[in-house]
Amino acid sequence: LALSLSDTVYQSYTGTDNFEDRQIKNIRALASVYPNAVQLVTLAESDIKSIVDLKGKRVSVGAPGSGTELNVRALLEANGISYGDFEPQRLNFNETADAIRDGDIDAGFWSVGPPTSSILNLAATRDIRLISLSSEEVANAQNEVAVFAPYELAAGMYDGMEEAVQTIGIPNVLVVNADMDEELAYKLTRLLFENTDE
């Protein structure tokens, strides 16, 4: 059993992107467990209103090789934006929040299940704004990565967030070996669905 982002599972199963020349055909997704949401955060007084406004700015794209960085790169490239268009900073979640708070960067990305503790903490100390994606930007991302899906961050999720924010979500899936016994797969799936409230 493993828990993985579905884009990574898709790449490994199809032998594409990071899994070129090392395809893994004997895996199956047993269930979608919860979604990560790409969250782009800046300070409320920032002039950044869309992903296009990131050009020329200092932007955290997540820790090197992280799911955040992979998701962000795919999202931006699908919308004609490359790392050469801004100053990418490879910071983890807490470092990103601290750097936004201290004015060391202009914006930062998170790809994680919301609400996110580091964003909650940042919103408690500074006025922040989450940046919405346009419907076209979401569609462009979906065309690039089959497992990307529209996702809405609910109004009020973070202090000062008065409106819902449109973004993309990436399911985290429970991955198993293709040879897993069918009865065991059934029992695991039943256990998950019978305990969703827990």
Question: What residues fall within each predicted segment?
Answer:
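Short, glycine-/small- and polar/acidic-enriched structural segments
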Residues: L1-A63, L130
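Pocket-lining segment of extracytoplasmic ligand-binding domains
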Residues: S6, T16-D17, S46, S82-V175, ...
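Short amphipathic alpha-helical coupling segments at ligand-binding clamshell hinges
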Residues: E183-L191
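Acidic/His-rich structured neighborhood in mature extracellular/periplasmic domains
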Residues: I51, P64, T68-E69, R73-N79, ...
